[in-house]
Amino acid sequence: MSINLHSAPEYDPSYKLIQLTPELLDIIQDPVQNHQLRFKSLDKDKSEVVLCSHDKTWVLKQRKHSNTVLLMREFVPEQPITFDETLLFGLSKPYMDVVGFAKTESEFETRETHGELNLNSVPIYNGELDFSDKIMKRSSTKVIGTLEELLENSPCSALEGISKWHKIGGSVKDGVLCILSQDFLFKALHVLLMSAMAESLDLQHLNVEDTHHAVGKDIEDEFNPYTREIIETVLNKFAVQEQEAENNTWRLRIPFIAQWYGIQALRKYVSGISMPIDEFLIKWKSLFPPFFPCDIDIDMLRGYHFKPTDKTVQYIAKSTLPMDPKERFKVLFRLQSQWDLEDIKPLIEELNSRGMKIDSFIMKYARRKRLGKKTVVTSR
């Protein structure tokens, strides 16, 4: 099989070549999905360009190469082409003519990544009465009114964006998209649990209307910050929406809620000081609404604490730790000379950017050994 190749190329920067993975090719060939593919970036100059489907995001990386890549198309010559068949060296006659019309020195590689929300214009809501007035005074900041508008301007797929929005406690207040502060989110969760239990609502089948009504019955003040949208935000973060239910209902994630209360207890009682674990467990339990049905264990708070001694606990904020792996291990071993493998993993996993096996990653900076049924990690 052979073709006649004609060439009249010029370098044309308007053409961009993108490597298509098998998954991307399948999406392009699927009429149901291909219209959902979008190119996005945060701005025109500095941000990386990403390609988004309905549920995934790929970052584009430009790769220059020394070879010349020709862009070609089929064409019909004005005059028939004649040639000496002996020059074919036994190949069949050319069956078509193509012409190289442009050339490029680079192509874009697609790598799957985690999409991100653009939260630059999204304010924090702390339950204050004058929230709308504060927003109106921020004349230089664009106000975003809907989640669809936020997703349109964020380098992420729709499904990833919605999931992240629920995870961070995204909501709407007075027609403005906002994020609930950690303090207000904790208050809203506590009020929701207290009200739902007082009204004997089924914690495994909550709906927004009944829950909002139950919360409203307990608010005597004229100003009630716990709007329907706020209640839905709390349910989206701390519960799972039942897909098969006839009505929209949510099932509370009891272990996750217990962990959330535990993190608040760490910050409140053992931030900067240590406390016996048994005493801390009592204080943790005291934060829950009376008779809230959950079990607690210090292991639920891995990644948020260290143990100065075998029987004491103290809060640690991962955001304050160095991002350099070597320095982070040094800091962790200053806080605690010997770590159980399961306790240290949540504190160092984010640094394993190459996706190595966690044991291999740890061995680069520390020692690990078996002590009975446990694996412990110590400094070199």
From Swiss-Prot:
GO terms for cellular component: chromatin; chromosome, centromeric region; Ctf18 RFC-like complex. Keywords: DNA replication. It holds the Pfam family Dcc1. GO terms for biological process: DNA replication; maintenance of DNA trinucleotide repeats; maintenance of mitotic sister chromatid cohesion; mitotic sister chromatid cohesion; telomere tethering at nuclear periphery. Belongs to the DCC1 family. Component of the CTF18-RFC complex, which consists of CTF18, CTF8, DCC1, RFC2, RFC3, RFC4 and RFC5. Present with 1660 molecules/cell in log phase SD medium. PANTHER family: SISTER CHROMATID COHESION PROTEIN DCC1 (PTHR13395:SF6), SISTER CHROMATID COHESION PROTEIN DCC1-RELATED (PTHR13395). Component of the RFC-like complex CTF18-RFC which is required for efficient establishment of chromosome cohesion during S-phase and may load or unload POL30/PCNA. During a clamp loading circle, the RFC:clamp complex binds to DNA and the recognition of the double-stranded/single-stranded junction stimulates ATP hydrolysis by RFC. The complex presumably provides bipartite ATP sites in which one subunit supplies a catalytic site for hydrolysis of ATP bound to the neighboring subunit. Dissociation of RFC from the clamp leaves the clamp encircling DNA. This is Sister chromatid cohesion protein DCC1. It comes from Saccharomyces cerevisiae (strain ATCC 204508 / S288c).
